[in-house]
């Protein structure tokens, strides 16, 4: 209900938090191309009372890391930092939560400076709708703000919008999703992310998780 959203925890999860391990598909696995990828993502609700249009102000932070644990010294070869701040509006139908809309200002960076710096900012508009308790559709579009001569082609990799859907089993123990990220250009060049998760117990919030990207 709306009261539950208003009184919910100030600190919680945002995107999926996961650890995965594996090599790229189509190449022979080696210690150089087999790594751990993990993501940590949190959200901090900054307002208890509702703002105009029934929104709440949130602070977001997501960090993604590629960790070559099979190499000597186990280097972390690619780090991605993604802080943001924005408004979130929960959506209700007959006092039942059915989704949300969001407006965010985000920064994304590899945390380096000089010629190795890869960073950009964006204003993003997102939303998710629960079509029924087992099926959710979602999407996000962003206006990029790119600085630096080394970042001009970043939209060819990070894209300009994304959409997808997620399906849950009736008992909530199995879930699968697909996300399509449209890269820059007029052709049908999409990054595809497939995910599947199996919940060991309905009393647990831990999942066996697999991702193809």
Q: Where do the PLM segments sit?
A:
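Short loop/turn motifs that connect adjacent beta-strands in outer-membrane beta-barrel proteins
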Residues: 47-57, 91-100, 131-136, 168-176, ...
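Residues on the lipid-exposed face of transmembrane beta-strands in outer-membrane beta-barrel proteins
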Residues: 40-44, 83-89, 105, 125-131, ...
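Short, small-residue-biased leader/transition segments that mark boundaries at the very start
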Residues: 2-5
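Residues that define the transmembrane beta-barrel architecture of outer-membrane proteins
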Residues: 34-40, 55, 77-83, 99, ...
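Sequence/structural signature of outer-membrane beta-barrel proteins
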Residues: 64-72, 90-92, 104-114, 142-150, ...
């Amino acid at each position: 209900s709306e009261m539950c959203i208003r009184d919910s925890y100030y600190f919680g999860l945002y995107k999926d938090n996961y650890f995965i391990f594996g090599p790229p598909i189509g190449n022979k696995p080696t210690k150089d191309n087999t790594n751990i990828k993990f993501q940590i993502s949190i959200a901090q609700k900054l307002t208890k009372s509702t703002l105009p249009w029934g929104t709440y102000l949130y602070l977001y932070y997501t960090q993604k890391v590629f960790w070559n644990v099979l190499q000597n010294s186990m280097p972390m070869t690619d780090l991605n930092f993604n802080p943001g701040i924005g408004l979130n509006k929960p959506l209700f139908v007959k006092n039942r939560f059915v989704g949300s809309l969001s407006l965010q200002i985000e920064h994304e960076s590899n945390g380096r400076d000089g010629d190795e710096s890869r960073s950009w900012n964006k204003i993003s508009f997102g939303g998710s709708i629960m079509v029924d308790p087992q099926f959710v559709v979602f999407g996000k579009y962003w206006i990029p703000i790119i600085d630096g001569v080394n970042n001009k082609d970043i939209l060819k990799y990070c894209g300009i919008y994304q959409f997808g859907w997620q399906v849950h089993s009736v008992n909530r123990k199995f879930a699968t999703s697909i996300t399509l990220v449209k890269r820059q250009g007029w052709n049908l060049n999409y990054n595809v992310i497939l995910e599947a998760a199996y919940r060991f117990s309905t009393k647990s919030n831990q999942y066996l998780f697999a991702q193809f990207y």
